[in-house]
Amino acid sequence: MPIQVLPPQLANQIAAGEVVERPASVVKELVENSLDAGATRIDIDIERGGAKLIRIRDNGSGIGKDELTLALARHATSKIATLDDLEAIVSMGFRGEALASISSVSRLTLTSRTAEQSEAWQAYAEGRDMAVTVKPAAHPVGTTLEVLDLFYNTPARRKFMRTEKTEFTHIDEVVRRIALARFDVAITLHHNGKLMRQYRAAPDKNQYERRLGSICGATFLQHALAVSWQHGDLTIHGWVADPVGAKQLPDMQYCYVNQRMMRDRLINHAIRQAYQDQLSDEQQPAYVLYLEIDPHQVDVNVHPAKQEVRFHQARLVHDFIYQAVMSVLQQASAPRLDMTEPETGKPVQWQQENRPAAGENHFAQPPRTTNSPSYSGKAPRTGQARESANSGYQPENPYQKKQDELYKALLQPTDNGASTPPSGIAAPSTVLHDSCPNRTATNTAASNNKQRALVESPLESQSTGFGRVLTVYPPCYALLEYHKGLAILSLPVAERYLKVVQLTPSEEGLRAQPLLIPQRLTLSKSELNVLSTHHTLLTRFGIDVFVESQRATLRAVPLPLRQQNLQNLISELIGYLADYQTVETQQVEPDALASWMATRLQSEQENWSHSQAIQLLADVERLCPQLAKTPPSELLYMMDIHDAIKALKHE
């Protein structure tokens, strides 16, 4: 048979073999076109599982009359024009194959109208050469696509279609995934004239959980942990189910990259690894996660159905997702403090905190604008997803809006710098008074005066923190309101002390975090001997180095070392351990090794922001309380404010 150019219809049918797998594929391609057109409402009508009819109607920008013929042509698109556009795709579609492929295996009709046109136009392709016919029609601004008799001219493909129920189930799943990706778009789904799904638009973030609950169910919502992390151009947000909820939701895995639904193995591996031993091998995590990344750093043109992507910095993306999910799960599983009085069993009244903005572990994330804390120790009974960073005690009674207002008022500093409990919330000392009702009136009055004095003028001995961060003096010094005075604190020194504590192993040792790509280490024979000699010590520090036949492979490191230059750090570590081997009577102490590594770690910050300083000091107060009580001179310096005051006095 001689070489010849295939007819357009046959070429399109071959292309349809990859694009149009089943009716659900048609729905996906057409709905994504509607989203690219800026539609805010999409109506989907299905008959007989999509075999008889698929109709997609939207209120997008529409297609002009002059472009209708090109819309049904192969490799014709308005999404990209140059190779540079292909390397930074921001639209759902970009190949220009969908409509041509679908029209070659069905009877497709395209009706559209733009806002500039006074009437709509309808186009359809037919014949061996796929000639396009255009005629006037009645239609509002937007586009309607009708796909009739799918695979009518390809009997082999039609034979492999499943039952009507099965095909509609696949369509329903596609619509669910799209509805989770675009909360701002209203979507309705009809099957055989019956309304099956109606997803109302949720333009406000406060309404996201309503759609999340309608798609994922109440079980997922009750076990959901909110995720919100940022690092450079990488942002991840969404929800993951705690291990208990994940065991009940085996098929709840939704992941999106720049609002594009994905089934990417790298992302799935990072999330699965974050759960680690909390799920068995046959169990799957449950999550709805949204990854935002610079379009130049991801290639979406690597899969026929665009269900997989290729990241230019795969290791960075993997570690970022892993750290975000793992931190949320660790915070949720952290032990809770007993917040009840031992005698009465009643919840302790709200008490003053030393820092309103204490403690969320951001991955170089700018501060949030939300000021309302939430308390969610276990799955909320109200059906609202928990905020992972604020997991704590949840009273038996549901958390009320009034309590939220009272608590926020408690955190607001007064003019004299002290926080006064609002009405309805007892001060810390009033709990003792309430538990001892049999007092005389005189004793009660004296006690109240003493309590008032304690609230208005807290003793210095009661201060267990660094005080309030007033500002940050560039690049790395924090000005503090400390012990009724002003103090300068070195943030790099505080960070070093914190890393020493984080790197000091407990009895169980530090948890090893597996690397996405194990690193081969080029070492001499003597260096390999050092690794073998101190293998137990390194394992206790969470450093997993596999030595075999004169080769070494670094497979895991503890969390504080993940972002370091591991090749250089391990080389310096071997030299440090080798120095100890030269003196036979000395052994490496874990505390000394932790201090040494902390001095070698590169700081993640060069120019500190106010929120980062608050976060660091909150972590230091929590993990190194002794530093706040008796700070060393290299960490904190008290300023003499009296000289400045004298300079302002004019006799």
From Swiss-Prot:
It holds the Pfam family MutL_C. Residues 385-394 have a biased composition (Polar residues). Residues 336-398 are annotated as: Disordered. Keywords: DNA damage, DNA repair. SUPFAM superfamilies: ATPase domain of HSP90 chaperone/DNA topoisomerase II/histidine kinase (SSF55874), DNA mismatch repair protein MutL (SSF118116), Ribosomal protein S5 domain 2-like (SSF54211). GO terms for molecular function: ATP binding; ATP hydrolysis activity; ATP-dependent DNA damage sensor activity; mismatched DNA binding. The keyword DNA damage applies. SMART domains: DNA_mis_repair, MutL_C. PROSITE patterns: DNA_MISMATCH_REPAIR_1. One of its GO terms (biological process) is mismatch repair. The keyword DNA repair applies. GO terms for cellular component: mismatch repair complex. It comes from the Bacteria. This protein is involved in the repair of mismatches in DNA. It is required for dam-dependent methyl-directed DNA mismatch repair. May act as a 'molecular matchmaker', a protein that promotes the formation of a stable complex between two or more DNA-binding proteins in an ATP-dependent manner without itself being part of a final effector complex. Belongs to the DNA mismatch repair MutL/HexB family. This is DNA mismatch repair protein MutL. It comes from Pectobacterium atrosepticum (strain SCRI 1043 / ATCC BAA-672) (Erwinia carotovora subsp. atroseptica). The lineage of its organism: Bacteria, Pseudomonadati, Pseudomonadota, Gammaproteobacteria, Enterobacterales. The gene is mutL.
